[in-house]
Amino acid sequence: MFNFVDIGRQILSKMSKIIYTITDEAPALATYSFLPIVEAFTKPAGVEIETRDISLSGRILANFSEFLTDEQKISDDLAYLGKLAVEPEANIIKLPNISASIPQLVAAIKELQAKGYAVPDYPEEPKTGEETFIKAKYDKIKGSAVNPVLREGNSDRRAPKAVKEYARKHPHSMGAWSADSKSHVSSMTDGDFYGSEKSVVVPKATKYKITFVGADGSTKVLKEGASLLEGETIDSAVMSYSKLNDFYAKEIEDAKAKDVLFSVHLKATMMKVSDPILFGGVVYQYFKEVYDKYATLFDELNINPNNGLGDLEKKIASLPEDQKAAIEADIKAVYEKNPALAMVNSDKGITNLHVPSDVIIDASMPAAIRTSGQMWGPDGKQKDTKFVIPDRCYSGVYQTVIDFCKKNGALDPVTMGSVSNVGLMAQAAEEYGSHDKTFQLTGAGTVQVTDEEGNVLMEQAVEAGDIFRMCQTKDAPVQDWVKLAVNRARATNTPAIFWLDKNRAHDANLIQKVEKYLKDHDTTGLDIQIMSPADATQYSLERIVKGLDTISVTGNVLRDYNTDLFPILEVGTSAKM
């Protein structure tokens, strides 16, 4: 016979434990002072606090235990939390953690090695099977390796009322805007992910395979054996590398002609396969004369533009003085010829092309909008800026905010309303789950996505250098997302706007699902609309200046962008959401 009392006690025991994560940098430092305070409150209540290490160094050690002594080995806490996250009793406090770029990953490896941990070097260009295996393990650690594992649910985020009221009484600084501002967003008009996207709703459960079929008839399986669920939305898209480089070259010239700073805004951390390549493209194009002139030497030094100018500077430091000086002189000549670069640190000469993880779009664009639409130049002064965001999918959001501020001036934290967010995040939805399905092709041909019966679900033509990307969005998270939006709209009596573009293949399929699943709920008296991201931005801004609130109901990327953009403008930071 079941002892329901004992079962109940076991459940309560499990639910009275909180997992507190150990991460990196500032959050790790804060933990030393904050965690004892948390424990002082939870212990009398019978709530246990358990720490788990998901820091970059911790994840490296956990994945390379075969290189360590028994005393150095640690548990794979991220894998443990990934299993725990699907359990109903899970209570996990996930602090911000590093989404490491290659330079950050390499620095962490060197630091561990210096402390006596014999972890292997990161082989950027593996030459053996063992090096290929090591690189693959490290590639799972770099970028946003934590969030896709832990984010099993959708997102419902807003600034607490107390934080909003504090910002109104103690407003943060907002730079003045000029109607004559030359700041603007530049995106591709052809050859980007947006323009090439195809989308399919899977009619029945199956397994899929991604295959490259070369123009010469050769084939290469890029991924196979992965599952698809009934009703799942899958997409494929291609970024043309040749058109991307043409775009960069044109925008560099345009920034020079307009006398504005040149900047690029990507997410090389979360989009750890595609965006470092996009970043490397602009680094190469800006310093093209240098990379072309020293191509053989740079190849010998393993200098990859994807790692930024900082990697170049570091690797030429050991060259003979005359050779190093010649390269530095050529770099200086490029600076003088090309438009001035937006800076990460003007005093130290660190540009926004130095490190791929230094300028991250969801933080960098709101910061610039808050600062009169300007960034800092090499002279340490603010200046109007060209914001290069290659893909069109979401760049219109930022251009709309810029246009609005040019016309109406800076937003006022004292009077402005709020834009909260309900985000489609669960089970690695959309682009943020695409890492293992993103490939840079080495030749011309087509990339096919086929089901287990051999039917072609999607097909994309590619050229050498192009980036192919496939995304998945499961149906259950979409249904939950719609329910969350309806519940939030009713609880707050606030308009809920689905930010979906009917002219984009993926969004067109999602619009059909949203319209279908809204019928499962009582929406009487609610204001629920579907708008393109640019139109939804304009609508939200028109309300925000009147002190009115709006709910943005978005996909995974815009969840990330909006939960930085609006909080930074409203309360000065996204850390208080």
Protein language model features and the residues they cover:
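Extended, well-ordered protein cores
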Residues: 16-280, 289-513, 517, 521-577
